[in-house]
Amino acid sequence: MDIDPYKEFGSSYQLLNFLPLDFFPDLNALVDTATALYEEELTGREHCSPHHTAIRQALVCWDELTKLIAWMSSNITSEQVRTIIVNHVNDTWGLKVRQSLWFHLSCLTFGQHTVQEFLVSFVVWIRTPAPYRPPNAPILSTLPEHTVIRRGGARASRSPRRRTPSPRRRRSQSPRRRRSQSPSANC
């Protein structure tokens, strides 16, 4: 069974696989970023968003993998076998966790739509033959104007918005019609 964990977010595992392996930060940096930006939302009891849930799940998976590696390291006597297993875990499962954390952190930071646009534009760029593509790859480093990053989650108090009065409108939205004079009125 081929399950795509990004399907519900409008993306795909295949699309993320076009990004080079060294594109994704190391796990410690991603965990530090998640903790610094969203610790309250990740440890709180309330459900914030599917992205928060996915980050929680990725962190739980990585924690379990770390425990497995520690157990294998202490129980496997052959240094060569231990190195092969640790490298395999880091190159396969570790990469999947890095991809997942990067994707969901980016969606929370930049907005899901912006991340999807970036992925599509990067795939188009990388699949275009070098002589025909621009020299620089698309980057996900600037915040679009419509993205707002809120600190403190949904529980933060917000000041009420002031509304500017709208211009007065005519009662009827249809165009005004002039009364045409009847031919008998001209007589």
UniProtKB/Swiss-Prot annotation:
Record's subcellular location: Virion; Host cytoplasm
GO MF terms held by the record: DNA binding; RNA binding; structural molecule activity
Composition bias type Basic residues, residue spans: 158-180
Primary location group: virion
Presence of the UniProt keyword DNA-binding in the record: yes
Lineage top rank: taxon: Viruses
Entries under Pfam families matching the protein: Hepatitis_core (PF00906)
Sequence segments annotated as region (3 X 8 AA repeats of S-P-R-R-R-[PR]-S-Q): 159-181
In-chain residues carrying the UniProt-annotated modification Phosphoserine: 159, 166, 174
GO biological process, one term: symbiont entry into host cell
Keywords: Capsid protein, Cytoplasmic inwards viral transport, DNA-binding, Host cytoplasm, Host-virus interaction, Microtubular inwards viral transport, Phosphoprotein, Repeat, RNA-binding, T=4 icosahedral capsid protein, Viral penetration into host nucleus, Virion, Virus entry into host cell
InterPro entries xrefs: Hepatitis_core, Viral_capsid_core_dom_sf_HBV
Sequence segments annotated as region (Disordered): 150-187
Segments carrying motif Bipartite nuclear localization signal: 162-179
The Sequence repeat ranges on this chain: 159-165, 166-173, 174-181
Post-translational modification remark: Phosphorylated by host SRPK1, SRPK2, and maybe protein kinase C or GAPDH. Phosphorylation is critical for pregenomic RNA packaging. Protein kinase C phosphorylation is stimulated by HBx protein and may play a role in transport of the viral genome to the nucleus at the late step during the viral replication cycle.
Entry GO terms, CC: host cell; host cell cytoplasm; T=4 icosahedral viral capsid
Renumbered residue ranges of the record's region RNA binding: 181-187
Functional summary from the UniProt entry: Self assembles to form an icosahedral capsid. Most capsids appear to be large particles with an icosahedral symmetry of T=4 and consist of 240 copies of capsid protein, though a fraction forms smaller T=3 particles consisting of 180 capsid proteins. Entering capsids are transported along microtubules to the nucleus. Phosphorylation of the capsid is thought to induce exposure of nuclear localization signal in the C-terminal portion of the capsid protein that allows binding to the nuclear pore complex via the importin (karyopherin-) alpha and beta.
Family statement: Belongs to the orthohepadnavirus core antigen family.
HAMAP family in alphabetical order: HBV_HBEAG
Subunit structure: Homodimerizes, then multimerizes. Interacts with cytosol exposed regions of viral L glycoprotein present in the reticulum-to-Golgi compartment. Interacts with human FLNB. Phosphorylated form interacts with host importin alpha; this interaction depends on the exposure of the NLS, which itself depends upon genome maturation and/or phosphorylation of the capsid protein. Interacts with host NUP153.
Protein's UniProt name: Capsid protein
Organism: Woodchuck hepatitis B virus (isolate 2) (WHV)
Higher taxonomy: Viruses, Riboviria, Pararnavirae, Artverviricota, Revtraviricetes
